[in-house]
């Protein structure tokens, strides 16, 4: 199609549907066009880049931005930055070049719904002490911070133990394209870097690793960017001691777990948000924005989430667990479970909490605050204030209009 034809088709759709988020609408439109065009030429050995709808395309782009931005690596990081994993290459490596790697990842699918349909790989659980050490090693790593406990443990269990018996073994080589992330369990590894740009691994192996940079010790890690990119390694990592033990995680396993987790979570958020009456005036794109802004928080049994008499500033959806609504002088008036929500009126009014909500069991919540809500929706908030539910008094059966049980259909 010519540019004029595409433009006319897009303009007609915009005029017909009058979307509130024009940029999102255009993004989805071109994503569908691109998908249709690629489907004509797709071959079995090419990268799977199709999506079932524009929402997944948008989600995938946002997820890549979230976890792969250069700003994610802070100045206080204790690890060696920008060391990726290793990819099989058609070169002659020396005998002590350790090929702890699989084949090229160029055919891996990055479609989150495709991950959800795959047969889930199971990994044997690690010894509790090993798992504890791995958790300590990756604590604070930006790649792991958004995983819930289940998927966090799944990632750690997916790591495989590798033993390197000799000193002088190159685990990764500068210039090679890699796809593994490593945690050092035992032994030490030296990091070297050549100053040349675009140097090849063959040149590194034939003329030396370059300048010494630092030494990686047990409990530290390297190669984390290989979990997101198949970009060339920025340095070489060579075993310094004999009898080394490292744990390796490949990019496909990691991304499958992370993308599947985030995709399922977003779909859950969107379905729950559809059941919130005060958000009923929002269109699909506005609810998607809210779903993307939700953050997961966990409260242990007995913890207070909101307290009666406080000014409300947060909205909550229950992902898992149970919460009790407690009124002064009345005790527990209702128990909220998965799919229920509370605090929504705090988003559009300066409301005082008329009840306390406390965790009855371990409670997993999705939440966002009023400033985020205002930033995302702007003028739409005025429309929400005029809805009958928003104008009602705070005298429902819980004594607080912002404590609400969702319809039975949302229960799991």
UniProtKB/Swiss-Prot annotation:
Keywords: cAMP, cAMP-binding, Nucleotide-binding, Phosphoprotein, Repeat. Belongs to the cAMP-dependent kinase regulatory chain family. Residues 1-142 are annotated as: Dimerization and phosphorylation. The modification Phosphoserine is found at residue 104. Tetramer, composed of 2 regulatory (R) and 2 catalytic (C) subunits. In the presence of cAMP it dissociates into 2 active monomeric C subunits and an R dimer. 3',5'-cyclic AMP 1 binds at residues 143-277. 3',5'-cyclic AMP 2 binds at residues 278-412. This is cAMP-dependent protein kinase regulatory subunit. GO terms for molecular function: cAMP binding; cAMP-dependent protein kinase inhibitor activity; protein kinase A catalytic subunit binding. GO terms for cellular component: cAMP-dependent protein kinase complex; cytoplasm; cytosol; nucleus. A motif (Pseudophosphorylation motif) lies at residues 101-105. It comes from Schizosaccharomyces pombe (strain 972 / ATCC 24843). It comes from the Eukaryota. GO terms for biological process: adenylate cyclase-activating G protein-coupled receptor signaling pathway; cellular response to glucose starvation; negative regulation of adenylate cyclase-activating glucose-activated G protein-coupled receptor signaling pathway; positive regulation of protein export from nucleus. InterPro entries: cAMP-dep_PK_reg_su-like, cAMP_dep_PK_reg_su, cAMP_dep_PK_reg_su_I/II_a/b, cNMP-bd_CS, cNMP-bd_dom, cNMP-bd_dom_sf, RmlC-like_jellyroll. Pfam families: cNMP_binding (PF00027), RIIa (PF02197). Residues 392-412 are annotated as: Disordered.
């Amino acid at each position: 199609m010519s540019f004029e034809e595409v433009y006319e088709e897009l303009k007609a759709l915009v005029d017909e549907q009058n979307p509130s988020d024009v940029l999102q609408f255009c993004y989805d439109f071109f994503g569908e066009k691109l998908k249709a065009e690629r489907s004509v030429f797709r071959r079995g050995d090419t990268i799977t880049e199709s999506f079932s709808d524009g929402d997944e395309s948008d989600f995938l782009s946002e997820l890549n931005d979230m976890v792969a931005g250069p700003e994610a690596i802070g100045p206080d990081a204790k690890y060696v930055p920008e060391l990726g994993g290793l990819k099989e290459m058609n070169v002659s490596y020396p005998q002590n070049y350790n090929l702890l790697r699989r084949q090229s990842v160029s055919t891996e699918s990055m479609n989150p719904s495709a991950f959800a349909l795959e047969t889930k790989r199971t990994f044997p659980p690690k010894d509790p002490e090993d798992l504890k050490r791995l958790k300590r090693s990756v604590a604070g790593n930006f790649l792991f911070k958004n995983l819930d406990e289940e998927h966090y443990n799944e990632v750690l269990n997916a790591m495989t133990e590798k033993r390197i018996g000799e000193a002088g073994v190159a685990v990764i080589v500068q210039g090679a394209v890699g796809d593994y992330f490593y945690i050092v369990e035992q032994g030490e590894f030296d990091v070297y870097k050549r100053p040349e740009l675009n140097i090849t691994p063959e040149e590194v192996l034939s003329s030396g690793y370059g300048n010494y940079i630092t030494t990686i010790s047990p409990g530290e890690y390297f190669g984390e960017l290989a979990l997101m990119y198949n970009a060339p390694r920025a340095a070489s990592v060579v075993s310094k001691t004999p009898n080394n033990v490292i744990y390796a995680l490949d990019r496909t396993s990691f991304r499958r777990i992370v993308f599947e987790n985030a995709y399922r979570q977003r779909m859950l958020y969107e379905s729950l948000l559809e059941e919130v009456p005060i958000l009923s005036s929002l269109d699909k794109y506005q609810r998607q924005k809210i779903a993307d802004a939700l953050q997961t928080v966990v409260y242990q049994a007995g913890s207070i989430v909101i307290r009666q008499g406080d000014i409300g500033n947060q909205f909550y959806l229950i992902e898992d667990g149970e919460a009790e609504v407690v009124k002064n002088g009345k005790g527990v008036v209702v128990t909220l479970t998965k799919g229920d929500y509370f605090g929504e009126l705090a988003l559009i009014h300066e409301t005082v909490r008329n009840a306390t909500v406390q965790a009855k069991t371990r409670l997993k919540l999705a939440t966002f605050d009023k400033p985020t809500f205002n930033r995302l929706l702007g003028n739409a908030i005025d429309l929400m204030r005029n809805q009958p539910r928003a104008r009602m008094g705070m005298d429902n059966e819980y004594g607080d209009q912002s404590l609400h049980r969702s319809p039975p259909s949302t229960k799991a």
